[in-house]
Amino acid sequence: MLLLAIDTATSAIAVALHDGEHVLAESSTLDARRHGEYVAPGIVEVLARAGRTAADVSAVVAGTGPGPFTGLRVGLVTARTFAFARGIPVFGACSLDALAHQTWLQDAVELGQSFVVATDARRKEVYWARYDVTAGGVVRKGAPMVAKAEAIAEEVRGLPVIGRGAVLYAESFGARVGPLDVSAGALADLAARMLAAGQQLPDAEPMYLRRPDATPPPARKSALP
């Protein structure tokens, strides 16, 4: 298996190749406003570094967010287009879960510990979820949510916080540990483990949690009688 992973749910435009056991190559560019400019070059880069071609890729996994509308859409559309052109399956995986899995891979949290993943949702809000650490990995407790950082400060008090939200809203959260943005290598590793265990991955559908910031203008009333 050669798995192409793409995530654009955070400030990182992240791409990786995974052979089912190891990350072969990974690319990450930080730019919260220019996802569309970097994701395709990232794919070219990881294929070249791994000595592979697009024809070698057997499946694609895309981070489904939650994340800001425009950036998240770039990664998902790219993943679907690549998979369609190659006639291969495309899967989705929650980007918060990928960040949590990345934290576990880095041994940044301990067995039995609970922690929070919080990424930037703009408008002084975060996308967040709570996780427990088990011997086999991390387990999310409930669905991802979006909220003002200050509104969940009491609920998460005392818990380590992973993700860029911990930096942007440090006054609302506890100690920051682990990574800030999603690693496509961790996303690929999470997906590969789930597939190997016979678990069904979700479709590559975006998890927005709220309406986009940009909305179409209201229709003008006709001046004609």
How does the language model describe each region?
Residues 182-195:
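Short, flexible loop segments at boundaries between secondary-structure elements
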Residues 1-66:
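N-terminal beta-alpha supersecondary unit
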Residues 48, 52, 193-200, 214:
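Generic secondary-structure signature for well-ordered alpha-helical cores
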Residues 9-12, 124, 202-203:
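Short, basic and Ser/Thr-rich N-terminal targeting/leader segments
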Residues 22, 34, 89-183, 198-201, ...:
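Surface "functional belts" at beta-alpha junctions
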Residues 44-51, 100-105, 153, 192:
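Generic structural signal for well-ordered alpha-helical scaffold segments
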Residues 61-95:
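DPxDG-like acidic metal-binding loop motif
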